[in-house]
């Protein structure tokens, strides 16, 4: 029996099936591609402000951020990094607070030093401890201890240090040279400082009025830090103004002030070259030392910077000011956010760029001690006091600023009372004991 032949669908039916199948296939492929592309494309939002954090001119406002974004995007294809430009530093705190209240804060954002404790205490920041401990490409030993500690709250890490600033001592080299005095040594002491100030403080025109001075704007707090004095307990529940190191600080400041015979040097005296020393931040040094800013500021005399003079029980210590970077506790992109934080705060290339494009110090110690840093600081071939080893020592010795809620109020009161002691308005005998009791009573309420 002959089997029936099967020749498939009719010719017209074949065309109809093919005609229907091709568009269906293309539609499925298009939908699949669209879904995959949109699933892979992600946006990371960051919060930054324009300009310097240190109140000095900065030409290339977003140079470091732009470089970090470009490198991050290359490492994370399909990812967009977005930030709102043009926010001034003085407006940034309010802007960030508004974003947080609206629930639209960035995934990653800069934290002003004065705001860190607030955001950490209210649970707005992601605890980074696990990410830091679990990342084999991340080692906290590469950071300066004080900078890293600035991002710690309640013994947990909530932020990474981006860049730092420390206080140095501005030295009027022209004035010292005129008095046959050399630049201070790297380990100079209070006594060295006092001796130079005594020698240069004088009436140069013979009218009976002092017109040249040793120092301007040097505070008892800066002296206390360099003498190893600890003013407060870290949690702000106690103060230590009656400590022997503070007694030494007050005596030193009284002796220093007595050189001026009741006169107070002014900013104009300093600007016109009639003052030998003034505390000066590293950011100010970086901004005003090289051309062209040195022509616009302090151009009438040669100057440099040295470390802060050391007290009998201290070291050449400065308070470390740090710009921090935190992660929102509400972000849904924790891994991506951590990668960006690590890139900006830890990547050697980006940290080197902080030296090149900003007025701040990187947070990585090996970058400060690098050959590139030596080239950047080599402005004065004769005798620059600001060298990588000196800055490294300053950062290693640096201490954290106090950040407990009542700090500003306590310091305002302490400053007023200590100024009275130094000025001789309040007798020094037992004054610090009394001050300690008064401030402790307020702190422990």
Task: Give the positions of each predicted feature.
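Extracytoplasmic/periplasmic substrate-recognition and gating elements
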Residues: 4, 8, 48, 258, ...
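Conserved N-terminal structural module of periplasmic/extracytoplasmic solute-binding proteins
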Residues: 2-118, 312, 425, 429-445
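Hinge/lid segment of periplasmic solute-binding proteins
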Residues: 87, 113-166, 300-307
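Paired acidic/hydrophobic, glycine-rich loop segments that form the ligand-binding mouth/hinge
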Residues: 107-110, 276-281, 286-288
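Extracytoplasmic/periplasmic solute-binding protein
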Residues: 154-162, 167, 191-239, 275-277
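Short, solvent-exposed loop/beta-turn-alpha elements that line the ligand-binding surface or hinge
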Residues: 129-142, 186, 205, 211-213, ...
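Glycine-centered hinge/linker elements that transmit conformational signals in sensory
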Residues: 196-197, 235-264, 308
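Long, aromatic- and glycine/proline-rich binding clefts that accommodate carbohydrate-like moieties
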Residues: 355-420
